[in-house]
Regions:
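Ligand-binding pockets and gating/stacking loops
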Residues: 1-199
Length: 199
């Protein structure tokens, strides 16, 4: 294999890389091709298929942990979703790897008692909604909020903080959106997240 000039670091680790040359697509429209790449199916009106990440998250959840099983980095508005697997298997989206994910830190004035009180109120409201015939949707919503609450309270939230990496390590990955995304992906995989995609 010949590696292009300027890719010397890649050449050094080629034994760790798999090159896929058999992947083709005859779909000319980008959105449909992206859907097929992520699900294995062309879009159809009747069925919304889950992305591969959602399937992996469903089959290999992180046991008793507070990190999501599927993280999608740098994909604002481009995620395919969890399809018929439900919202609990949807990707945890990180738009910008250089920042903590949106809405994961409690406000300074919000202590644990108030935080728990708000979650309790939410549970009461969801119970009322579920009794009106929306039980499946409420169960999905409850699972998402429970996961979010665990993450907000977790010491593992620092996994998302790539600023804690040395400047030298950040330079190795590159201080671009993609480079920062790959650095975050490495940190997540090291913590046991089974599926991470970087766009």
């Amino acid at each position: 294999i010949q590696i292009a000039e300027g890719w010397e670091n890649t050449a050094r680790v080629m034994k760790e890389i798999s090159i896929i040359r058999s992947m083709t697509n005859n779909v000319a429209e980008h959105t449909r091709a992206q859907y097929q790449l992520h699900t294995g199916y062309l879009p159809s009106g009747g069925v919304k298929y889950p992305t591969f990440g959602s399937i992996v998250a469903s089959d290999f959840p992180i046991p008793k942990d507070d990190l999501p099983s599927f993280v999608s980095i740098g994909t604002p508005g481009n995620t395919i979703g969890s399809g018929f697997l439900g919202m609990s298997q949807a990707p945890f989206v990180v738009n910008d790897a250089s920042k903590l994910p949106a809405n994961v830190s409690k406000a300074n004035r919000l202590d644990e008692q108030r935080f728990s009180g708000r979650l309790s109120l939410l549970e009461d409201l969801e119970g009322q909604y579920a009794n009106k015939g929306a039980k499946a949707r409420v169960e999905d919503h409850k699972a998402i909020y429970a996961n979010a609450a665990r993450l907000v309270r977790s010491p593992n939230l620092k996994t998302f903080d790539i600023a804690s990496e040395s400047n030298e390590m950040q330079e190795k990955y590159g201080k671009t959106a993609f480079g920062r995304g790959c650095l975050l992906a490495r940190r997540l995989v090291e913590r046991g997240v089974p599926f991470v995609e970087v766009e």
